[in-house]
Amino acid sequence: MKRSVIFWLTIMLTFDIFAQPGFLTVAEKSDFKSTSNYKDINDYIDKLLKSSPYIRRETMATSIEGREVPLLIIGNPLPKSPADLINDKRIVVYIQADIHAGEVEGKEATQMYLRDLLKEKNPEILKNVVLLVCPLFNPDGNEKISPLNRTYQNGPENGVGVRFNGQFLDLNRDAMKAESPEVRGVLTNVFNKWDPAIFMDCHTTDGSYHVEPTTFCWMVNPDGDNSLIAYMREKMMPEMSKTLSDKYNILNCFYGEFFDMLNPGKGWVLDASEPRYITNYYGIRNRLGILNENYVYADFKSRVMGCYYLIHSLLDYASGHKSEIRNILSETDKKTIAKGDNPSVTDSFAIDYNVRPLPDKVTIRTYEAELVNETNGWKNYHRTDRQQDVTVPYYIDYYATKNVRFPFAYLITIKDPAITDLLKIHGVKFEKLSADARIEVQRFDINELKGSTKLNQGHYTNTIDGKYVNGPVDFPAGTIIVRTAQPLGNLAAYLLEPQPNDGILFWNFLDRYLVPQWGLGYNQYPVYKVLDRTDIKSKPEI
């Protein structure tokens, strides 16, 4: 009885606190002239924690400069850990903001959404959803707020942070190589630990002129399960768009940019398909990834409110379709495991791909543009005041142009903790060969290895050419075995295949092993493929 009285007293006090005018975000208090810094965010989180029994905080990561990356868990009942959700019918949704700290709408919108959600006595959404929120994924970049950053952006006038983290890394290019504490934190403490069904990452556009303040799209990499891409493209995203427009009165369109601003009829394209982009990465994991891009030239308040109502639209959909989504994801995992357990000759993995338009065109509200000679000698597009609506092809359907066989397993012959640690961070399961064995495999013989001429995120990234050769190879006990009969089998393939544009070879994890000391010829690529189902004696990795 005493505990019940305390609980309801807490609820009553909650609504007194939420009713106070002081429970506003920095953006709201400043009439959308400013955005929150690190202290502002943490003070606001403290208010939320004191005001509601439905929220708690964890630390997802600690940045290179020593700042905590917050993870907020919201639920009714509030789970203490993922173990509480084993027999729970609710769906887990994760929303992340400020991965680029100059793109701050999501940071403000998530704070506002949580306040408004938690002031309800018994939030309807929380009957069906466990919500995870990180309002500040890049705290080091956020602390560099200045009006000199992103000066072309339409507010907030008192400035925003910078794109990169404390290591000068773009966190939205780090999903595969996982070099930053922030990305390692989200992989370990959110994706692996909580396994959200849906993930949305909030950004601001840098591209074409249009009217809609809010844009979004879905994961697109063709090495993810195509049935999930089709579900988002054909059902989930159109329904969210309609809700955002009809229920919340927010103009919106699917994200992209024009091939040619002077001739927008050529098409609207999403040109970021690799899994280094974290929403595409999430699709490779057999889950639903959403990219939110708020229109850079809309005023700051419109961008924040558009993002705020997009969050509403997402959670409306997730709450109303929780069973459907859970079933789709469960079936996709089973399908991936079955493919890896006994792959056929037709099971393939794309190592190169291209984009084509969807069958249906999209309408974008845009402006005529002019190409202007700047005083510095550059030529830039300038928007005119002449608005036009264009119905154009939407290039977002990525498809394979070159495939290799999807294997039963990969065998890794080098014992490098950087590689095994990377597999663990991603949640990819692996074992070790329990005894010496001769195994029929496919090896990759290198003909040419090239590093890029320019640095990319601190790397001279690799491209490789060679040929596949089948035959028996003797492997010693302790050889690492990565079986593809696991939910993350597609991710394992992307990391370990020699030729993808985002694997361990591309990001230089194998450089020291590929070229002999004196630089003559090439060593054997140290990852072998077991193409067909094979009895491999193994022991678990401890």
What spans do the regions from the language model cover?
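Positively charged n-region of N-terminal signal peptides that target proteins for export
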Residues: 1-4
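Soluble metallo-hydrolase cores and metallopeptidase-like ectodomains found primarily
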Residues: 39-93
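Boundary at the C-terminal end of the N-terminal hydrophobic targeting segment
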Residues: 17-24
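Hard-cation-handling environments
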Residues: 258-441
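Active-site/substrate-binding loop(s) of hydrolase catalytic cores
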Residues: 86-96, 104-237, 241-265, 270-273
